[in-house]
From Swiss-Prot:
PROSITE patterns reported in the protein's UniProt record: RHO
Organism: Homo sapiens
GO CC term (a single one): endosome membrane
Pro residues composition bias: residue spans: 10-20
Molecular functions per Gene Ontology: GTP binding; GTPase activity; metal ion binding; protein kinase binding
Cofactor(s) it depends on: Mg(2+)
In-chain residues carrying the UniProt-annotated modification Phosphoserine: 25
Name of the protein in its database record: Rho-related GTP-binding protein RhoV
Location(s) in or outside the cell: Cell membrane; Endosome membrane
Quaternary structure and interacting proteins, as annotated: Interacts with PAK2.
Lipid-binding residues (covalent, S-palmitoyl cysteine): 234
């Protein structure tokens, strides 16, 4: 049949609407909880502020408990990292321990120019962490690295009869002893190695979560296999 011409009064045939192109769904955002622990005044808050806000606090302000949230991309996938800034004073021991159980990674911080804060890593902070969270990875972080060679700081340490700055090999040795993922020194003021610290924390947390998920899946498979085995014998 030859094509038919439409009259002016006859409406054109309706066409099915073209569906819009499908958009690829964004990958789900992975959440990571990172808790910073360490003595008061070692620079935990400064690390977080410098990393998240690209700034440096003008003066020291003791922290009870603060949280910061940052989104980063890891291999193109979005990751939301929550940074928990805890107080190092004994008055906040009970409050601080409440945030430990569901933590994905810890940053155990000490100041390289405060030897007592380094000593407290093994005497206070690691035991406290492991009491409430025995599995999460720990990174040992030496803060205030810009003061290691500061003349005024060295004079104050000498006049006060205190030890000098914590040697890097000693800190590295402690990291190996406590089975920390690594030891890193950084400066919130100059931001030297600052990004490396949090990058390492994020990657350590992701690897830890992947291991837990793999272990959980393997446990589920074993449980399912045992159930089927029991049912098999019941039918026999």
């Amino acid at each position: 049949m030859p094509p038919r011409e439409l009259s002016e009064a006859e409406p054109p045939p309706l066409r099915a609407p073209t569906p819009p192109p499908r958009r690829r769904s964004a990958p789900p955002e992975l959440g990571i909880k990172c808790v910073l622990v360490g003595d008061g005044a070692v620079g935990k808050s400064s690390l977080i502020v410098s990393y998240t806000c690209n700034g440096y606090p003008a003066r020291y302000r003791p922290t009870a408990l603060d949280t910061f949230s940052v989104q980063v991309l890891v291999d193109g996938a979005p990751v939301r990292i929550e940074l928990w800034d805890t107080a190092g004073q004994e008055d906040f021991d009970r409050l601080r321990s409440l945030c430990y159980p569901d933590t994905d990674v810890f940053l155990a911080c000490f100041s390289v120019v405060q030897p007592s804060s380094f000593q407290n890593i093994t005497e206070k902070w690691l035991p406290e962490i492991r009491t409430h969270n025995p599995q999460a990875p720990v990174l040992l972080v030496g803060t205030q690295a810009d003061l290691r060679d500061d003349v005024n700081v060295l004079i104050q340490l000498d006049q006060g009869g205190r030890e000098g700055p914590v040697p890097q090999p000693q800190a590295q040795g402690l990291a190996e002893k406590i089975r920390a993922c690594c030891y890193l020194e950084c400066s919130a003021l100059t931001q030297k190695n600052l990004k490396e610290v949090f990058d390492s924390a994020i990657l350590s947390a992701i690897e830890h979560k992947a291991r837990l998920e793999k272990k959980l899946n393997a446990k589920g498979v074993r449980t399912l296999s045992r159930c089927r085995w029991k049912k098999f014998f019941c039918f026999v």
